[in-house]
Amino acid sequence: MSDNDIRVGVGFPLGQLACALTTAGTHEDEATRQRAELRVRRWQQVVDGMAGGGLDIGSRTPVRGLPAWVTPEVVHGGFATGEPAAGGPLRPDETDRAQRLGLPADRRALFWSWLTDAGLEELGELLDSGRYRVKYAEETALPVVAWLLRAGERDAALGVLDEIAPFAERLRFTPAPSDQRAGDPDVVYRQTAGDVRRILEQRQPNAQIETMREALTVWNPFADELLTLWCETRDGGRIGAVTLDGWLPRAVQLLARYQQLTAEHTLCSKHRNPKGSIGVLRTALERRVAGAELTPRERGLVQSAVDAMLRKRGQPGSPEHTALREQQAREAARPRHHQLAQLVAARLAGLPQDIGIGDVDHVLRPVDADEAHPAGVVAGWPTPRPVARVVTRAAAGTLEQLIDRGVIASAEELARLTPRLAAATAASAYPDPALRILTDATYRAFRNRRSLLLLNLEHQVRVAELPWVQAVASARTDTSDTRNQARRTLVRLASAAVCGFPATLLPNPLVGELSTLSKQASLQLPWVEELAADIFMGTFSAKFLQAAKLAGRRLADSLYARYYDIDYPAIAAIDDTSRRLIRRTRTSDAFDHLCRDRVGASGKRSWFNVAANGVIIEQAQILTTHNLATIAELGIDLPSTYLAKRCMDTVLRLTARIHHNPRPLGTVKNNAHAWRQMLFFLSLSSWEGQEAFAAYAEKRLATQPDHVRTRLAPAVTGLAHVISGGKFDADGRAGTGRRLLGWTTTEHWMLDPGPRD
């Protein structure tokens, strides 16, 4: 960094450390406290590293002494802790290898053991088998060295070793062995069978349910016996009038059993209440067994308790009482969720643990007859929804299938799964099968690398910067087939994102994948990331101007341009992108000024005013359509009206969440995102379709609660006004209509619409 660059302070890490300390010291759940203690250690590392100069947060190389290609351990907000992610204790397979070879239990010894003839032969066998599991990209470095040596690329292999050997003591450079090869890249899953099995195995009994079962199976029958015993003393309805032969010995037995039940069944406490029915009858029984006569007050309490119990449930043994107890017994006999969770976990134990579940329905089938008795449940009982929801997270299928099933429920979840497909596409350019599998694993592991907090227009480390990836670059073949495959994957992912989640901004990880695929397909398309308002540097890279120009070619004079008052021809005329002396990233002063001018901001940058930064960033998103125009450039057939209606559904849902929301600004911002995407899709439809949509929006709004109608009516009115040919004034108003934006430096008009109840 230069002296002119902005640096990150310790305020945020200190705040996170304080929160973690509070949770670790006060939370009632032990597992939560343990997780908080881990966060405390990591945030303490961040604070200490920043204070001591070991960390340079905001840089691509935030950890002193570690090159950019090392995967750093990163905590919330993109802060590096100072530790490498591929470090830590030896894995079990590493420990086994050290013991087998008689080596010291340290990584340096293991590192050099792989470079012996025997070690290289093992690596070669591992490469050919494809049976390994890569968690961090560093773990493919030595397998690449083995491949290079086998391919006769000795100098390239030595070059990789020169880069990684200085870190042999801290990092692991080999993958963990696995029982299985990598599966079909087209099949994805959110979690593995092993992941959900462990979750189900940890499912504990529900305390409330268990308490209810104890009441139904233990204390209700005891209460019936107690009531029956007292009813035997009635004469003409008066309790305690007679004492039959054998009554007192049976009373002694019942009280002894009460002591036993109390010791064995501790969940219920109602029976201990001396003023409750059981408490009154039991206390009176103890008095009689002790040889004392009941006082008039005690006799009256017993009489009242017996009469109340008989009125409520009837005489024990009567048809109505028997029917009630039989119904309660059936309720108590219902399998509990934790029992069924354990049963399903046992089914999952027989499946491959490192991949998803191909046939979820079979795993979730009703209880088999041979499973019922060992599990203590009823044969034919269906799997409860809470258990099914956990298992479904491991469902394996194509992206489209998982979106349709609701397994992938957000664009963020989609973004987490796309590296598998993108990795296979990138690896397809390597003809050698072993190297292709290894490259696929490297790419997927690299995409799981957490993003760093970066300042001064720095970009995240790219996979091509890894020394071992550079070393095999010459083995890559760029053909029309590989380019076509990259384009197909690009179109597929973009289509899945925009059609699956039309009201959501593309998450930055997905934007990165689409950008990489575009380059592999030889398509020069501008993909822009969502910028963080709290670290915005006041300028945009040149690709934002390129994206705005691309949007203008499609949207000039459209509903979108008229709604947001965009002069796309003027944007097309901007041509001032250039490289700056203090950074490598190209920028456009004219585009920066345009974004600030559109919100009436001064020329002075507002690095430390989040709201002021947010309104400027939002204008860049408006001008560029935040990747929607770029997606349309791919020629994807977008069902525009259908997508616009789905956006409207999201807008209504988000508007409803504003009501009584103590922190509504994030919801308002997401609402504006959905509204903007709706406008883009509407702009792709005909004028007749737009008019019909305006009527549709008003009709949908009319069915909403008062607080939703009041908050959203200005936006719907403003939309109809622009569709009919009108314009907003300089303040974004048109009569009672308003232009809907997400960011503001004053109170947002949606937050004070009038009625609050």
Task: Give short role names for the model-derived ranges.
Residues 1-757:
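Long, compositionally biased terminal regions
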